[in-house]
Amino acid sequence: MGDPEVLLEVYEVIRNRIEERPEGSYVAELTEDDDTKPAINKICEKIIEESGELILAAKDGDREGVVYESTDLIFHVLVLLAYLGIEIGEVFDEFERRRK
C-alpha cells in the first residue's frame, strides 16, 4: 500500500502553485479567473467532471479506471481546498471526529 503522506505532499505542491503561479502550471491556470469564467467555477466543473468519470468507471467494473479517476477527483478536491484556504488538516480532523 502506498504512503498516505503523499496527500500532504501533493497538497503542499498545489498550495505552492497557487501562490507562486509558475508559467505553464495547470493548477495556476485552473485557479485563475479568466475572461470566460471565475476560477471557482472552473475548479467545481472539474470536480463534477471527475466525479462523473469515477462513477462510470465504477459502473463498468473498471478497477484500474476507478483508481485513476479517484486520483483525479481527490487531486481536484485538494485544489478546491487550497484555493479556498482550507487546510487539509481540517479535513483530517473531521474524519477523526466522525470516527468517534
UniProtKB/Swiss-Prot annotation:
It is found in: Cytoplasm. The keyword Ribosomal protein does not apply. Pathway: Amino-acid biosynthesis; L-histidine biosynthesis; L-histidine from 5-phospho-alpha-D-ribose 1-diphosphate: step 2/9. It catalyses: 1-(5-phospho-beta-D-ribosyl)-ATP + H2O = 1-(5-phospho-beta-D-ribosyl)-5'-AMP + diphosphate + H(+). Gene3D superfamilies: MazG-like. One of its GO terms (molecular function) is ATP binding. CDD domains: NTP-PPase_HisIE_like. The keyword ATP-binding applies. Keywords: Amino-acid biosynthesis, ATP-binding, Cytoplasm, Histidine biosynthesis, Hydrolase, Nucleotide-binding. Transmembrane segments: none annotated. Its EC number is 3.6.1.31. GO terms for cellular component: cytoplasm. Pfam families: PRA-PH. GO terms for biological process: L-histidine biosynthetic process. Belongs to the PRA-PH family. This is Phosphoribosyl-ATP pyrophosphatase. It comes from Methanopyrus kandleri (strain AV19 / DSM 6324 / JCM 9639 / NBRC 100938). The gene is hisE.
